Amino acid sequence: MEKTRKLNRIAIQEGRCAVLQGSVTDMAFEDSRFDAATAFETVYFWPDLPRCFREIWRTLKPGGTILICNESNGDTDKDERWTQIIGGMTIYKDIELKTCLEQAGFHEVQIRKKKRWLCVTARK
């Protein structure tokens, strides 16, 4: 949290940014509040992926976008070594993320891969 506050100091001072800590499973925001949501290297650790995507869907405005970006895309056995080193980590393949997003109500799911990286976008 401290590093985030430091990196965003000016935006915070100008009232353009707020740094809050919470859980993606139960966010304390009203429905349809945000235009976009991002998840960089975090979905690996979410406890209940479908529930988390439903919660993000709830907080996005109609037409809002979610962007997920992961360094490990699950396409090789090398990715699994991380799950043995880091407790509680799950590496999802593109089809798993797409399925969970669609089940949560998202559409226009787009998948982009480059080397071992995976980026997924979807709209509410």
What residues fall within each predicted segment?
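A short SAM/SAH-binding and catalytic strip from SAM-dependent methyltransferases
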Residues: 36-49
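A short glycine-rich, Lys/Arg-flanked "PGG" loop and its adjoining helix->strand segment in the class I
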Residues: 50-62
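Short, glycine-/aromatic-enriched active-site segment of Class I SAM-dependent methyltransferases
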Residues: 71-88
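Short alpha-helix
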Residues: 88-104
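Core SAM-dependent methyltransferase catalytic element
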Residues: 104-124
